[in-house]
Amino acid sequence: MATHRLVMVRHGESTWNQENRFCGWFDAELSEKGTEEAKRGAKAIKDAKMEFDICYTSVLKRAIRTLWAILDGTDQMWLPVVRTWRLNERHYGGLTGLNKAETAAKHGEEQVKIWRRSFDIPPPPMDEKHPYYNSISKERRYAGLKPGELPTCESLKDTIARALPFWNEEIVPQIKAGKRVLIAAHGNSLRGIVKHLEGMSDQAIMELNLPTGIPIVYELNKELKPTKPMQFLGDEETVRKAMEAVAAQGKAK
């Protein structure tokens, strides 16, 4: 029997998603389409009459703006919001800023898929000569991180390793206390939570594509195990198209 409900949403399309570039920790804006996706997600939540008590997001504006759109569209702007770097997207290291299709043409689709989808193989690290090094590694929003916490690149395994402690220590107690939680974050940090909730294998989580801007609903029992598969809020066609679009990103044009 379900005793808790959790809602998660991957941010709407960003300008770099639109350009098919590896985004990671670069603070890209939502595209026009991404803004519309966030508003559509808000409408789906409003239509489902869902209310929340506390919200969590990353420190990247594409996720924050998605959350804002949902809170605005559901008239819940007053809710407390916790922002944390631990829910950031996976750090794509030296690939940050590169067009995925061009990278596939240069290195081969298989290598790009390994970098994007392998569980424990990180991309090349971002060094000090990288054009986005200063705007990420020297950014004051990360000034409070302890030595060794700021990544220069991450595998999916690394991303999950820094997201899950926040889930376990901060979010889980709120859910167990009966709070209705909304998380607006990124494809890979959310994958970490999904993998943990569903007990998925490393291989299975690599194949999971979370669509942008479409709310994901979990009904959980008191042990925080799903009582049924994840549900998407939205019409079937919207969900199917979104998941196909995500899967197609790493292919050479």
Curated annotation (Swiss-Prot):
Gene Ontology, cellular component aspect: cytosol; extracellular exosome; nucleus
Stored Gene3D superfamilies: Phosphoglycerate mutase-like (3.40.50.1240)
Protein's GO biological process: canonical glycolysis; gluconeogenesis; glycolytic process; Notch signaling pathway; response to mercury ion; spermatogenesis; striated muscle contraction
A Pfam family matched in the record: His_Phos_1
E.C. code: 5.4.2.11, 5.4.2.4
Tissue: Expressed in the heart and muscle. Not found in the liver and brain.
Binding site for substrate: 10-17, 23-24, 62, 89-92, 100, 116-117, 187-188
A molecular-function term among this protein's GO annotations: bisphosphoglycerate mutase activity
Modified residue annotations for Phosphotyrosine: Y132, Y133
Catalytically driven reaction(s): (2R)-2-phosphoglycerate = (2R)-3-phosphoglycerate; (2R)-3-phospho-glyceroyl phosphate = (2R)-2,3-bisphosphoglycerate + H(+)
Subunit: Homodimer. Interacts with ENO1.
PANTHER family, sorted: PHOSPHOGLYCERATE MUTASE
Protein name per the record: Phosphoglycerate mutase 2
Lineage start: Eukaryota, Metazoa, Chordata, Craniata, Vertebrata
